[in-house]
Amino acid sequence: MQTTLQITPTGATLGATVTGVHLATLDDAGFAALHAAWLQHALLIFPGQHLSNDQQITFAKRFGAIERIGGGDIVAISNVKADGTVRQHSPAEWDDMMKVIVGNMAWHADSTYMPVMAQGAVFSAEVVPAVGGRTCFADMRAAYDALDEATRALVHQRSARHSLVYSQSKLGHVQQAGSAYIGYGMDTTATPLRPLVKVHPETGRPSLLIGRHAHAIPGMDAAESERFLEGLVDWACQAPRVHAHQWAAGDVVVWDNRCLLHRAEPWDFKLPRVMWHSRLAGRPETEGAALV
C-alpha cells in the first residue's frame, strides 16, 4: 500500500479527502484501505487525479459490476453537446438533457427508480466553472440517528414508490423520440416500492432512503405523502450532515449511494461543465425492490 496515503475527514458527519494516492496505479492493499474508508465515511474525495475515461472505468470496476447507462460503463453529465456547443441556458429552451441536469439539483439517490438501485458512483470533473456547480452530499445514516422516536417508528412502517418519470415531470420532461436525453429510467413501467429505512448490507447501519424520486407512500393520500417526504428531506439535509464539494478539473469522488443523497448546485449555464459518471451496480438481493 502507498505509505503516503492520507485520509482527512471533512468535519461533517460524512466524507473525507484522500491524498497520497494515484487511483490509476492503486495496488490491492491500497484499494482495500480505500474501501474500508469508503464504508466508514461514505464519501471519498480525491483531488487532482486527472483520470482518463478508461482509467476511471478500471477503478470503478474494483468495486464490482458497473450499472451500464445507455450501454456504456461511463457517461457524460454535461451541458455541452457532442458538437462542442453549450446547451440552451434559458429555461424556456431547455432540452431534456438540461431538464435532467436541473432535476438533479434536487436531493436524490441514484437509480432508486430502477428495479435494482445503485450501490455507489465514481464521478470526475473534466471542465468546471470557477463559481457554482458544487456537488452536495447528505448523510442519511446520521439523519436516521437524529430522528425523534415518533418519526423513527413511522418511517420503519412506511415505504414509497420511486420514479424518474414522476420526478422529471415536475420540470415538464416527457420522454419522446429524438430526445436529447438517452431515456435511462424514463421507460420503466413498473415502479419500485422501497422502505423509507434501508439497512446497509456491509456496515449494518440504517439510513433514510428518500429524495426527489420518492413519492406515493401507501396509506397516505398524495398531498400528505408529498408533505411528509419533502419535510423529511428538508430536515435531513442540514448541517452537520451535509458536505459540499467545490470542483477543480481532475477531481474524483466516490460516494456510497446506499446511505447518501446528493445534488448539484446551479452555475451560469452559459458556461461549460463536463463531468464523467460511472455508476456502481447494486446487488439484487440487497438493492432490489418490489415492483408495483
UniProtKB/Swiss-Prot annotation:
Optimum temperature is 25 degrees Celsius. It holds the Pfam family TauD. Fe cation binds at H108, D110, H262. The keyword Secreted does not apply. Keywords: Dioxygenase, Iron, Metal-binding, Oxidoreductase, Plasmid, Vitamin C. Its EC number is 1.14.11.43. Optimum pH is about 6. SUPFAM superfamilies: Clavaminate synthase-like. 2-oxoglutarate binds at T135, W247, R273. Its cofactor is Fe cation; L-ascorbate. It catalyses: (S)-2-(4-chloro-2-methylphenoxy)propanoate + 2-oxoglutarate + O2 = 2-methyl-4-chlorophenol + pyruvate + succinate + CO2; (S)-(2,4-dichlorophenoxy)propanoate + 2-oxoglutarate + O2 = 2,4-dichlorophenol + pyruvate + succinate + CO2. Pathway: Xenobiotic degradation; 2-(2,4-dichlorophenoxy)propanoate degradation. GO terms for molecular function: dioxygenase activity; L-ascorbic acid binding; metal ion binding. Inhibited by divalent cations, most significantly by copper and nickel, and by diethylpyrocarbonate (DEPC). Induction: Repressed during growth on high concentrations of 2,4-dichlorophenoxypropionic acid (2,4-DCPP). Belongs to the TfdA dioxygenase family. PANTHER family: (3R)-3-[(CARBOXYMETHYL)AMINO]FATTY ACID OXYGENASE_DECARBOXYLASE, DIOXYGENASE RV0097-RELATED. Involved in the degradation of the phenoxypropionate herbicides. It can also accept (RS)-2-(4-chlorophenoxy)propionate, (RS)-2-(m-chlorophenoxy)propionate and phenoxyacetate derivatives such as 2,4-dichlorophenoxyacetate (2,4-D), however it can only accept 2-oxoglutarate as oxygen acceptor. Monomer. This is (S)-phenoxypropionate/alpha-ketoglutarate-dioxygenase. It comes from Delftia acidovorans. The lineage of its organism: Bacteria, Pseudomonadati, Pseudomonadota, Betaproteobacteria, Burkholderiales.
